[in-house]
């Protein structure tokens, strides 16, 4: 199905371009969200008549997004979650959680504006891209920690997960002593 794009769509094209897409993508995403029109002769004429208005509206949205981007870019947000000793979360941090945190901090960002490839499942600092407008993208840092104190340590760059560090020489001496006590035939079973 051919559609006329009403705004820039990532990996598809710029505003005003006629592109060929699969019918399901056109119906369920592009047409439903007002990002495109079916490429009929009547719609092509209507688009050309409204092109100046659409470009002005797009420019206005982009300047609003850039104003928000200046405030949001480089910001750091803390999420407190439960996790195991190795730093793996019980559950995950999804785009819904990220949208809630940003909303609580005074930014209006929808969950569809985060471009996470997969949910965050570990403690630590994570850089998350936020698409405020098809032409404006910023990165925020999400600090996932078990407590506010741990979040502060992570922000300073300290490690917070428990790692068992073994001194191999000490371990070797302990194993050797245990074998010596067990007798000469203990290791041959």
From Swiss-Prot:
PROSITE patterns: RIBOSOMAL_L9
Signal peptide: none
UniProt keyword terms in alphabetical order: Ribonucleoprotein, Ribosomal protein, RNA-binding, rRNA-binding
Gene Ontology CC annotation, any one: ribonucleoprotein complex
GO biological process: translation
InterPro entries: Ribosomal_bL9, Ribosomal_bL9/RNase_H1_N, Ribosomal_bL9_bac/chp, Ribosomal_bL9_C, Ribosomal_bL9_C_sf, Ribosomal_bL9_N, Ribosomal_bL9_N_sf
GO molecular function, one term: rRNA binding
Stored Pfam families: Ribosomal_L9_C, Ribosomal_L9_N
NCBIfam families in the cross-refs: L9
Family, as annotated: Belongs to the bacterial ribosomal protein bL9 family.
Function: Binds to the 23S rRNA.
Protein name: Large ribosomal subunit protein bL9
Organism, as annotated: Methylobacterium sp. (strain 4-46)
Taxonomic lineage from the root: Bacteria, Pseudomonadati, Pseudomonadota, Alphaproteobacteria, Hyphomicrobiales
Gene coding for it: rplI
């Amino acid at each position: 199905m051919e559609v006329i794009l009403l705004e820039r769509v990532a990996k598809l094209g710029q505003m005003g371009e006629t592109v060929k897409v699969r019918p399901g993508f056109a119906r369920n995403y592009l047409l439903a969200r007002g990002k495109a029109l079916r490429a009929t002769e009547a719609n092509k004429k209507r688009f050309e008549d409204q092109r100046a208005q659409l470009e002005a509206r797009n420019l206005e949205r982009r300047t609003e997004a850039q104003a928000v981007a200046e405030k949001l870019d480089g910001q750091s947000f803390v999420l407190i979650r439960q996790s195991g000793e190795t730093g793996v979360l019980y559950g995950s941090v999804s785009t819904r959680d990220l949208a809630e945190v940003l909303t609580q901090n005074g930014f209006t960002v929808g969950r569809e504006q985060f471009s996470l490839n997969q949910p965050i499942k570990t403690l630590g600092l994570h850089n998350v891209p936020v698409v405020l407008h098809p032409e404006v993208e910023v990165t925020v840092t999400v600090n996932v920690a078990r407590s506010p104190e741990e979040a502060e340590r992570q922000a300073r760059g300290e490690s917070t997960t428990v790692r068992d560090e073994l001194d191999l020489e000490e371990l070797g001496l302990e194993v050797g002593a245990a074998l010596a006590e067990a007798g000469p035939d203990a290791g041959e079973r």
